[in-house]
């Protein structure tokens, strides 16, 4: 598997992750497991010297779900990593995704609260803000479920207390599927996947949230926007 480098300077790298490739290893994984971080480290070994809260994740600034493809930012220095963490906390690190959905499914999955927002498809290009807290759900807590501010206390207690917002708009047709563009700053595991499924538009290939079967998950991180961690110049990198 080859590394697709999209941007490089002395402080950061931006790479395009293939679908079904883990971004980083788990703490318990062997060193031989193939991950995006491992591929990057072959060409840029210094990224392993950058260690945040999880030392085994190197300089990876943000993760994509294994099934998701697209842009990942990786710091080459400890200083750049610390600066990018501060940028994320200030909600200045924006990620943009494109998702495809062929099937409208208004029936909620178990554990989902009633959907309180507009349907992004019927808004025809108007931005719809879908917000929630999240709780882990199901066997081995592999899935997540949105939680609203007025949800029962026993559900609220299972969240981190952070409100997550996905801005979604319908952006046309691709083949037989509808395309939705999604933007967010702070993110939670499966956030885009869950928010779209909640709205009635599960992503193609997302069997976990009742999307139709497809070769890969039709979710691609197509752009990142943030101030450069050293120069502070605005950056927009897009594929």
Model segments located where?
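RNA pseudouridine synthases
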Residues: 1-239
């Amino acid at each position: 598997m080859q590394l697709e480098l999209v941007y490089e300077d002395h402080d950061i790298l931006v790479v395009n992750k293939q679908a079904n490739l883990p971004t980083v290893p788990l703490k318990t994984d062997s060193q031989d497991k193939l991950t995006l971080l491992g591929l990057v480290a072959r060409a840029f070994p210094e990224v392993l010297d950058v260690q945040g809260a999880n030392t085994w994740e190197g300089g990876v600034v943000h993760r994509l779900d294994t099934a998701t493809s697209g842009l990942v930012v990786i710091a080459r220095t400890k200083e750049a990593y610390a600066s990018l963490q501060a940028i994320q906390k200030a909600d200045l690190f924006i990620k943009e995704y494109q998702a495809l959905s062929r099937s409208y499914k208004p029936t909620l999955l178990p554990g989902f609260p009633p959907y309180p927002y507009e349907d992004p498809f019927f808004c025809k290009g108007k931005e719809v803000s879908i917000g929630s807290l999240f709780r882990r759900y199901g066997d081995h807590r592999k899935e997540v479920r949105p939680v609203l501010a007025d949800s029962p206390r026993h559900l609220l207690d299972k969240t981190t207390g952070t409100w997550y917002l996905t801005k979604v708009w319908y952006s046309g047709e691709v083949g037989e599927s509808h395309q939705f563009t999604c933007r967010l700053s702070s993110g939670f595991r499966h956030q885009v996947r869950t928010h779209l499924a909640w709205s009635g538009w599960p992503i193609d290939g997302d069997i976990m949230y009742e999307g139709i079967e497809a070769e890969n998950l039709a979710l691609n991180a197509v752009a990142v926007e943030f101030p450069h961690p050293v120069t502070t110049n605005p950056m927009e990198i897009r594929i």
